Amino acid sequence: MDNLWGVLEEILNRHTYLADRLRCPEAIASQEFSKLSKEYAELKPKVELIARYKKLKEEQAYLELLVKNPLEDQEIREIGKSDLQAIQDVIPKLELEIKRMLLPKDKDDALNVMLEVRAGTGGDEAALFAASLFHMYQKYAERMKWRFEIISISHNEIGGYKEANASISGSDVFAKLKFESGVHRVQRVPETESAGRIHTSTATVAVLPEPEDVDVKINDKDLRIDVYRSSGPGGQSVNTTDSAVRITHIPTGIVVIQQDEKSQHKNRAKAMKVLRVRLYEIERNKVQQEISSMRKSQIGSGERSEKTRTYNFPQGRITDHRINLTTYRINETVKEGELEPIIEALIRENEARMLAGVEVGFSGDKS
C-alpha cells in the first residue's frame, strides 16, 4: 500500500478543495456548482474509507510500540496484543477495498441499457427460453427498483419470443448487467416433448449502454424514414393508419423497425432510441478494440461469447462457465429474478483479475 499513499493523498486534497470551493458564494451561483457537488458526493465514501484506514494504521503503530514496551504493565500489554490482532485482521480487508476503489471505472457503468434477447438454436423451445430470460431480467429490474420499458416483442405461435427488446433505466444499470451479454444455454424437457427427452436450446443476450443524447450525433440527412401500416401475426394489418416506422441509417446500413405503438410519433421516438444505442455500440466497440489489451484481464467486454451460462432444469443447476460458478437456485433465479449472487460474483472476479493483472482472455468455451 505504500506506493498508493500519493494517490490517496490526492483524493483527500481534492475533497478538501471541493469542500472549500462549494462554500464560496461565487461557486454556488456558477454553472459548475452541480458538477462540483456531484464530484464531492462521489469522493465522500472514498474519503471516509481512507480516513478509517489511516486511523487504524495509527492505532496499529501505537499498539506495536505498546506491546514491545518492557516497562508497560503486563496485563495492559496482553490487552494491547488482543487489540493489535483485531486491527491486523481488518487492515488487509480495508486495503483490498481501497484497491478496488482505485480501479479504473468503465465510463459507461452509470448508463441505462438496451436489453436485447433473441432465440437461438432450438426452434420453439429456444423461443420459450428467450421469453424466460426476458422475464428474468424484468423481475431482476423490479428487485433493483429500476424502470423496465418494453420496446418491442416478436412472438412465435406458442407464446415464445423470437426477439424482445427493453430499455432499463436506474442506478448503475450497465455496471450490473454488462456481463450478461453472450449465449445462454438451457437444458430441459420441453412441454411439447412426449418422450421426456432433455433438449438443449440457446438464446443470445445483448446488453448495450444507452448513451446520453449528447454522446451520439445523428444528422437528418443520414436517415431514410418510411412509414406504413403495422401488421400482426400472419401479416394482417392491425392499424388503419400509417403508424409503423422504419428508419434506415444510410452510412452504416442499420435498419430499425418499430410498430408496437399506435402512434407514429411514439414509434419514431422508440426507433430513434434504438438507433442511437446501436450507433453508440459501434463507436464503443471501436474504442474497446483499441484498448483490448487492457481489457484481457476482465470477465468480458460484452461480446457474445459461445456459452456464457447454462441453465440445467433437471438438475436445478445454473453454471456460469466464465468463472466456474455453480448455483442450485434455478427457479429463484429464472422465475423470481434472483440474479444478484451471480452478478456480484462476476463483478468480484473481474475486479480480482484486474487487481492481479492476470492476462487471461474470456472465451466462455469451458464446459
Curated annotation (Swiss-Prot):
The modification N5-methylglutamine is found at Q236. Keywords: Cytoplasm, Methylation, Protein biosynthesis. InterPro entries: PCRF (IPR005139), Pep_chain_release_fac_I (IPR000352), Pep_chain_release_fac_I_sf (IPR045853), Prokaryotic/Mito_RF (IPR050057), RF-1 (IPR004373). SMART domains: PCRF. It is found in: Cytoplasm. GO terms for cellular component: cytoplasm. Belongs to the prokaryotic/mitochondrial release factor family. This is Peptide chain release factor 1. It comes from Neorickettsia sennetsu (strain ATCC VR-367 / Miyayama) (Ehrlichia sennetsu). The gene is prfA.
